[in-house]
């Protein structure tokens, strides 16, 4: 049986090894095919880059030709536009001159017409006033003639003296009335003249306002003409500058230096075109890599989510197993309870039998009482032990329940953690997608990579000095406290001393210090730096590490990690070589202190 089992296991082992070898072969084939595909892809990419560069160069030459032709067309169109503008300017000037002359003539005629109107109004008013005066004088004459006639008649009738006096007063009053009427008429005439003068002045004011507006329009037209003249002056200045530049053109003069500069500029433009093409191809490659990283993140998130569900299933299986175990324990306890009940029933039956035969066994009462007392004591002890056992069981159940609650909380927290990790990965993937969609491509400043170089120490110490310094450092670092050494026994102290010496010997070898800034004093750091080979690394590696810790999708992490690994390997190789060379030369020097310590006293005792 055992031989069959061994043969079966060997067969299974062979099958597993064969399957492993097949899997390794398939993996190698896949890797080789992937490498071939990558090489083909690189070749195709290089071919595409060369083709695009050639097309871009042709495009650049054609653009230059098109630019030259467009410049010629622009120059011709500029000349045509200049001639048109000159003709337009001439026409505008003529129109302005004609409009100005016409406006001046119109203004002169308007002023003449207004003057004639004013004179006409004044003549009409004077004529009206004179007519009114003539009519008034006629009325006065008629009144005076009537009065004279009346007076003559009354005189003839021989009126009394009183009547004559009254008549004289009446005539005087009438004369005063007439004089007052004349004054009123004169004042009315004066008022009419003033009103006419006011109307004339208002007309003059309106005319002056119109003239002012016309003068303002003329000033605006003059200002526009001045601005146009300034623009024309600027155009002429630009044309003059262009003419000066054309006069100073190196191609026209045939200067070799400027021609060389022009050739260099054309070469730099071609190089710029090639760099642009390469940049576009690398940009597309970067976008493809980002998409692959996005897919990987989504796959990781789904795997984390599946892992969370798997852990939940494992927890369920574990809880079911614990439930089955507890059910078995409960069944076992129920069986024990039944056995105890049977034993109790038998004990009660045994106690009932001696009570029936009590009349026959009166002599053996002493032994029965003694046994009864022992049984009672044993029962009490059993009950106390049962109580303690029940208390312990309750405590155990309480602790198990508490442990189960803690485990449930732990599994719930783990599940929440995994779900949160998966959600975090999904959110990161979404954030990367949104960045790729909406954020513009930032100008990435390419860091200038410094070359790695080895800085050898100037003041090289001898092997003995190095051993002395290293032994002093080892003694300072690996020195045990005296209190602990006194408490230990002599053999242990000797063994510790040997271990201490071995440690100090192992530490005396110089090491390549990749991070010299540790918890050491300044003078010790200086001593170590004199004995070590410094590696001045590339600053881009630190940036790559920082970007790696931040999980930024934009940073080329794989290249930075590979560079870092290669540099660390080179540093290790150089450090191992230096260790081998120094281990051959260095020998540990032991220093024994003059004071008596327990380490030195134990061998003497």
UniProtKB/Swiss-Prot annotation:
Residues 2-442 form a coiled coil. One of its GO terms (molecular function) is kinetochore binding. The modification Phosphoserine is found at residues 513, 515, 555. Residues 564-580 have a biased composition (Basic and acidic residues). The modification N-acetylmethionine is found at residue 1. GO terms for cellular component: centrosome; cytosol; nucleus; outer kinetochore; spindle pole. Residues 544-580 are annotated as: Disordered. InterPro entries: SPDLY_chordates, Spindly/BICDR_Dynein_Adapter. Monoubiquitinated with'Lys-48' linkage. Deubiquitinated by USP45. Its main location: cytoplasm. Belongs to the Spindly family. Required for the localization of dynein and dynactin to the mitotic kintochore. Dynein is believed to control the initial lateral interaction between the kinetochore and spindle microtubules and to facilitate the subsequent formation of end-on kinetochore-microtubule attachments mediated by the NDC80 complex. Also required for correct spindle orientation. Does not appear to be required for the removal of spindle assembly checkpoint (SAC) proteins from the kinetochore upon bipolar spindle attachment. Interacts with KNTC1 and ZW10. These interactions appear weak and may be transient or indirect. Interacts with dynein intermediate chain and dynactin (DCTN1). Interacts with the catalytically active form of USP45. This is Protein Spindly. It comes from Homo sapiens (Human).
